[in-house]
Amino acid sequence: MNVFMARLLFCFFAEDSGIFEEERLFTDFIERATASDGSDLREQLERAFAVMNLPPGSPERAAVPISAARFPYVNGGLFQGAHAVPRFSSRSRKALIDAGNLDWSDINTDIFGNMFQACVAPDKRSCLGEHYTSVPNIMKVLRPLFLEELENAARQARGHEARARKFIERLSNIRFFDPACGSGNFLIVAFKEVRRLEMEVLESVPALLPMPSVSINQFYGIEIDDFAHEIAMLSLWLAEHQMNQEFFERLGKRVPTLPLRPNDHIVLGNALRLDWETVCPKTAPAQAAPLWTVEPLLQRAAPDVREPEIYIFGNPPYLGSKMQSVAQKEEVKNIYGNSNSENISNLDYVCGWIGLGAEFIAGSPYQCAFVTTNSITQGEQVGPVWDLIFKKNIEISFAYTSFKWTNNAKYQAGVTCVIIGLRRKHVNSKSFIYNENKVKEVDKISPYLIPGSPVIVRRTKKPVTKKFPPMVFGSMPRDGGHLILTEEEYHEVVNKEQESISFIKRFSGSQEFIRGTIRYCFWIAPEQISQARKIFEIRKRLDLVSKERKESKAPSTRAYADRPYLFVQRAYKPTDSIIIPAVSSERREYIPMGYLDKDTVISNSAFAVYDAEPWVFGILTSRM
């Protein structure tokens, strides 16, 4: 069905955009050569698709009915082989004709990514970690990675034949590689931008015509989903046709689109299990001379065998560690397994692409840039990720600091992202930090995306000095909510049974502290349990806690079913404490902390520092 959809999209686009010489060739074929009830539409489409795989003059074409024989030879593998075509009713036949009556000529190939994402079920999209990338976000990656430099080179080459020739030759020797290409959005945008730069230079030096040198065969990708893989290949073909039309409009030279050239550089597979160099080789010419050239490209007598420039980019799947399958965790572990850092199991899935990208460009002039979650630039993920990168003598060339992910797709990703560019370490090269509409030139960028050297703050469970009291995880009830009281419930219980107040304490976590929400909890010591059970409301709640824990899947929770009056994890001390929320807004310059009295239990949604003197609070809230 995936191949069928790709073939349909191509035919609709081809009949409206001039790929097929006859306008409405495909739609008219459906209207005139098939029964109105749709009974023979399947067979007729199979015949038409087969014809588009037959070269001109082949014996098989002679036996084709006239209605189907008008279809040209397409090639490229799009119509190669028999693939399932669904059966049609009169209603579905009409829907197909209605689709053909739309004008597909000016369709933006970028929207196929949006369309693909809308077709994927939300649960599958979550499993794959797929997020469609809009053109503005794509340009945040491509411009600092290579486009800005190519634009500067194009400006220097305009009107100067020798420079222009060298520039065009350079363009033909670049490889562009997206190892998580999805439906091809990054590759399509990159292809269009590079072709337009080429046109600008050729316009200024007509002697270098007749034909362009940049080809879709310079664009490489890996995609794990078969439908997205088909759409990526199709979109590149359509994008090439659009740019050929633009080439004709600007330079008056017509470049034939058909027959399509095979494009086997978009590989179907798992990028974390494939050898990237087998997909995008580092050696040999990036492409042979284009099929349409009448003479060797730019008068060259032999193909260029220089080592190509390679740029790797993309928006890999995010998937936090808790969302990953066992197989996905193993894939990340295989990449970072030799790291001296702990907590490899907590790495986001996107870290796999960062690691393999660093491995690919190590010791070479190649560069890479990826959209990633901002998690890899903060907290415990920094150690294992950046240990691997820095050991390969790689540095950050540019970075976009945290921004909310937005696009035009139906399903928004709902994450905060960064963009990170990597290159071989240079002594005198400058780096750039982008923040909203501002850009700052710096000597070096730290793994926290601030100006500075590659220093990593290591995870530790112990204070840096014995003078600091320990910070501990808050107390976790695992009670099904039965040991916790809202402010209203607290007053109801206390008003009914005054003696219950001796078993109740204030209960505060991140939300309670930041928002000022008032909650309470039952906090009962073992020696108090017999007295506490005399109170009906407490006895009722303890029975519910016991039942909840017995039914738990966690052995550690079930072990406390016979002690329902206790929190399963207890850190509380009857002293004043500092509360440090585990989660707060990223827009805050400081983590909101505060002092709590000895009668407040800090929950597991926050951290606690007990017996802390005022100077400890001062250091914790300092930006030093």
Per-segment meaning from a language model:
Residues 1-2, 37, 41, 107-111, ...:
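Secondary-structure capping and boundary motifs in well-ordered enzyme cores
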Residues 18-42, 47, 54, 136-137, ...:
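Signature of N6-adenine DNA methyltransferases within the class I
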Residues 95-103, 118-136, 171-181, 213-222, ...:
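Glycine- and acidic
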Residues 1-189, 193-195, 218, 222-231, ...:
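Preference for the N-terminal adenyl/adenosyl cofactor-binding alpha/beta module
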Residues 124, 158-175, 262, 275-311, ...:
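Flexible, glycine/threonine-enriched loop-and-boundary segments that flank and lead into catalytic domains
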Residues 114, 351, 418-421, 506, ...:
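Conserved, well-structured core segments
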Residues 9-18, 34, 50-53, 120, ...:
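Hydrophobic/aromatic-lined pockets within catalytic cores
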Residues 12, 163, 169-171, 193-310, ...:
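S-adenosyl-L-methionine-dependent nucleic acid methyltransferase catalytic domains
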